[in-house]
Amino acid sequence: MNERLKEKLAVLPEQPGCYLMKDKHGTVIYVGKAKSLKARVRSYFTGTHDGKTQRLVEEIADFEYIVTSSNAEALILEMNLIKKHDPKYNVMLKDDKSYPFIKITAEKHPRLLITRKVKKDGGKYFGPYPNVQAANETKKLLDRLYPLRKCSTLPSRACLYYHMGQCLAPCVHPVSDEQNKAMVEQIVRFLNGGYEDVKRELAEKMHEAAETLEFERAKEYRDQIAAIEMTMEKQKMMLNDFIDRDVFGYAYDKGWMCVQVFFLRQGKLIERDVSIFPLYQDPDEEMLTFLGQFYAKAHHLKPKEVVLPSDIDGELARELLGVAVVQPKKGKKKELVELASKNAAIALKEKFYFIERDEERTIKAVERLGERLGIPAPRRIEAFDNSNIYGADPVSALVVFLDGKPAKKEYRKYKVKTVAGPNDYETMREVVRRRYTRVLKEGLPLPDLIIIDGGKGHLSAVRDVLENELGLDVPLAGLAKDEKHRTSELLAGDPPDVVPLDRQSQEFYLLQRIQDEVHRFAVMFHRKTRQKTMFHSVLDDIPGVGEKRKKALLNYFGSVKKMKEATVEELQRANIPRAVAEKIYEKLHE
């Protein structure tokens, strides 16, 4: 298990929710739900597992989670996340089934059905329900309590349901619209929360049956009450309408802000977006700025409705977005806003934890590096690297790390002036001389440690400049690479010798980061320098193309390749006269 996973496991909340396991490519490979995210997710990385689970665990490189308010809510969310991501390790919910809804049809003699598809057909839908068995039991209960028609087509004679008292038999007996309407209203009231009254009635009947020793009947009432309790759990993640809406929640602390967006489509939560950024103004103002930028992105289409916390200026938001903006004060929408805000607060807390851990770890790495080298903790480290191709366009780069973190404003680039050909030692001598001559002249801070990307020869050349030319006594170290161009050894001392380091230690990782960063910076600078050289040399012999037009062409096209792909008309767009553009085109296509 990598360090990142260990750290994320340490801050998991003991709350219900869903978790998404990801592989090294960031692909979601498994979605699960949990009563306690902390206990469930940790269980994957402790103890032994069967073959299938072990294969899953071996592929996990990262994970994320969404906190919910109940287990039922987590189950519904899990279903939607699985449908969205289609993870390869999820098998049970990979088909196109949905959890069931209870439906009252819009027919003249309405029926009560269990369906997995919601249509705009005038029917009344309730759900989806997180427990299939409970939904079926509730439907059976409603059938017994409210004797609506059962048959899909009216038969010529009364069926068994009529004789069981579960159907009024409109096939043979007149049933008025008022009777049907009254039953539908009672069912709607039941499913919308009036079930508590029914539970009380059933409880009374259960006690009466028990007193008269009708234990089977009492057991049936008890099971019906349990089924109601299982089914009627409220799911804040679901809204029983077809409106597409985005729900926003936010939290802020310590100069940072997190905004979480729940995307509800067709009444279902299908995705969420998490953004964490520095807070530069009042949170409510920052939220409005965020809204404008959020929907400016092409892949964020505006829904029919945006749901916002009540402390945001709703009128400004409506004017900004041009869609319906809702700021609920109660009900499911308010609970969704609160849930989004709760997840935002958790994400911020997690970020601060990692920041503190990273800072603590980085400082310790700096201190341990100093111990290994026998010097005080090198709070300021300056590192050099050269870059050239067979001596052409030689450059060098300097990066600065303060307390183990890159200080990019202090990075410097150097074009080599006095060295001809591929001479790495002399290049390093020139650049170090130029750097610290200026440092001394301008009274800039000296580093606590200088790191050279190179071996013993590089160290000897640099030490000669520092001590014999500039009179400086600054700790010096070299980083050697192996045949795969990876950090392999730390060299220090006079004469230079290998400093033993654990390759898994934080100080070794710090040196790797420094070496990778200075190499990246040097190579990027060399690439740009070489590109300019090639660009200018290609244009040198073309009449009418001076330095000003070379610069204009470089700024417009960026490379010889793109300029070569351009037509004469496109060349003219760089403020080049047509006659000159034709000459450039001919030269590039000789």
From Swiss-Prot:
GO terms for cellular component: cytoplasm; excinuclease repair complex. Pfam families: GIY-YIG (PF01541), HHH_5 (PF14520), UVR (PF02151), UvrC_RNaseH (PF22920), UvrC_RNaseH_dom (PF08459). Its main location: cytoplasm. Signal peptide: none annotated. Gene3D superfamilies: 5' to 3' exonuclease, C-terminal subdomain (1.10.150.20), GIY-YIG endonuclease (3.40.1440.10), UVR domain (4.10.860.10), UvrC, RNAse H endonuclease domain (3.30.420.340). PROSITE patterns: GIY_YIG (PS50164), UVR (PS50151), UVRC (PS50165). Keywords: Cytoplasm, DNA damage, DNA excision, DNA repair, Excision nuclease, SOS response. InterPro entries: GIY-YIG_endonuc (IPR000305), GIY-YIG_endonuc_sf (IPR035901), GIY-YIG_UvrC_Cho (IPR047296), RuvA_2-like (IPR010994), UVR_dom (IPR001943), UVR_dom_sf (IPR036876), UvrABC_protein_C (IPR050066), UvrC (IPR004791). It is found in: Cytoplasm. SMART domains: GIYc (SM00465). Transmembrane segments: none annotated. Residues 196-231 form the UVR domain. SUPFAM superfamilies: C-terminal UvrC-binding domain of UvrB, GIY-YIG endonuclease, RuvA domain 2-like. GO terms for biological process: nucleotide-excision repair; SOS response. One of its GO terms (molecular function) is excinuclease ABC activity. Residues 14-91 form the GIY-YIG domain. Interacts with UvrB in an incision complex. HAMAP family: UvrC. The UvrABC repair system catalyzes the recognition and processing of DNA lesions. UvrC both incises the 5' and 3' sides of the lesion. The N-terminal half is responsible for the 3' incision and the C-terminal half is responsible for the 5' incision. Belongs to the UvrC family. PANTHER family: UVRABC SYSTEM PROTEIN C, UVRC/OXIDOREDUCTASE. This is UvrABC system protein C.
